[in-house]
Design a protein with these regions (language model features):
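Specific aromatic-rich, kink-prone transmembrane helix
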Residues: 127-130, 147-150, 165-184, 203-206
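Transmembrane-helix signature of polytopic, membrane-embedded enzymes
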Residues: 108-112, 128-150
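Transmembrane-helix motifs of polytopic, lipid-linked glycan transferases
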Residues: 100-103, 112-135, 318-323
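Membrane-lumen/periplasm interface segments of specific transmembrane helices
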Residues: 24-44, 65, 203-321, 334-338
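Membrane-interface transmembrane helices that cradle and orient dolichyl/undecaprenyl
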Residues: 136-138, 173-184, 211-216
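Short acidic/glycine- and proline-prone juxtamembrane loop motifs at membrane-interface regions
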Residues: 159-165
Length: 339
């Protein structure tokens, strides 16, 4: 990467957009919570003492970011895993960070999670900017950071979710792999696998980077290839814990059934998504409550699910189109990471 005039201003614009997006989303959450409330989740049943949400104005500001997965991650950080409640579907690194970093925040794990997610998001944006800038100009790098900061789903980057941590670790893995720092890349991939099950897929871009740097020659394989095994090691560590604690090394996979999820080939998953989207369109056009995979709790929620399925299909098709576009223009290592 050769410095060019305007690099500094482009970087400042990128990070101003990243910071501004966090403040904007925080403000939207605050206004929404103040206007319509937060609902009535069983906070007192799940959040332990000193980890409870805030009250009043502070509650409107911070509590929206601890819902859904956040509640489970906080519960695990305090009470640990159980065999039959589906908690083992959540991998352990984020709850461990909550538990031990929480000491710095007086044990308030909601605030701890917000701090962890925002810090990881900031680090990820720095890495993303540098990654893009190595191959393109500063304007493209700044635009990339701006787009990912303002995409609607970027709200999860500051919630008590694993998205920011996983993005940071996966980017670090890929950047180090591109530079040939295989031990660091393997360590980052191991930690990513301890964050989310999809981390194990980082072995693909790592392997592509490895052999791309060796002109695709198997004969040039050296001792550094061993570091690729650090990727599945994270999964093996998690399975070992589950085996010792519950006698079920694959409990994390069985727990997916609690969330109505299962493993399937990509073609099967896409086929199911298309069927759900078609049924969703039929529901919205006909006004009828139709059931495909499981009944919804109340008729009105069927139409919300239909809208969700259609939006998900639209984003899937957009992503597929971008992947095809990238396949024709990006190096194999870059494309494999984006895949």
């Amino acid at each position: 990467m050769t410095p060019e005039p305007g690099d500094g201003s482009a970087a400042r614009r990128a990070f101003a957009a990243a910071a501004g997006s966090r403040l904007f989303i925080l403000l939207v959450g605050f206004v929404t919570a103040a206007a319509i409330g937060l609902g009535d989740p069983p906070w007192t049943l799940i959040f332990p003492r000193h980890a409870a949400p805030f009250d009043g104005v502070l509650g409107w500001l911070f509590d929206p970011w601890g819902h859904w997965d956040g509640v489970w991650l906080i519960k695990i950080a305090v009470a640990g895993y159980a065999e039959s409640d589906g908690s083992t579907a959540f991998f352990p690194l984020y709850p461990l960070l909550l538990r031990y970093v929480g000491v710095l925040f007086g044990g308030n794990l909601l605030l701890t999670g917000l701090a962890i997610s925002v810090a990881c998001y900031g680090g990820a944006m720095v890495l993303l900017y540098r990654l893009v800038r190595e191959q393109y100009d500063a304007r493209t790098a700044a635009l990339t950071v701006t787009l990912i900061s303002f995409v609607p789903t970027s709200l999860f980057f500051q919630a008590v979710y694993t998205e920011s941590l996983f993005l940071l670790l996966s980017l670090a893995c890929f950047i180090w792999a591109r530079k040939g720092s295989w031990k660091l890349a393997g360590l980052a991939a191991l930690l990513a696998t301890l964050t989310r099950s999809t981390g194990v897929l980082l072995i693909v871009p790592m392997a592509v980077c490895y052999y791309e740097q060796r002109d695709w020659s198997w004969r040039r394989t050296d001792q550094h290839v061993v570091n690729l095994l650090l990727v599945p090691l994270g999964l093996l560590m998690w399975m070992t814990y589950l085996s010792l604690a519950f006698g079920r090394p694959l409990l994390f996979a069985a727990a997916q059934e609690e969330w109505r999820r299962s493993f399937a080939a990509p073609t099967v998953a896409v086929g199911r998504a298309l069927a759900a989207a078609v049924l969703g369109a039929a529901q919205l056009l006909s006004g009828q409550n139709l059931t495909l995979y499981w009944p919804v709790p109340k008729p009105s929620s069927a139409f919300g699910m239909a809208e969700h399925n259609l939006v998900s299909l639209a984003f899937f098709l957009l992503a597929a189109g971008l992947l095809y576009y990238g396949y024709r223009r990006l190096p194999p290592s870059d494309w494999s990471y984006f895949l």
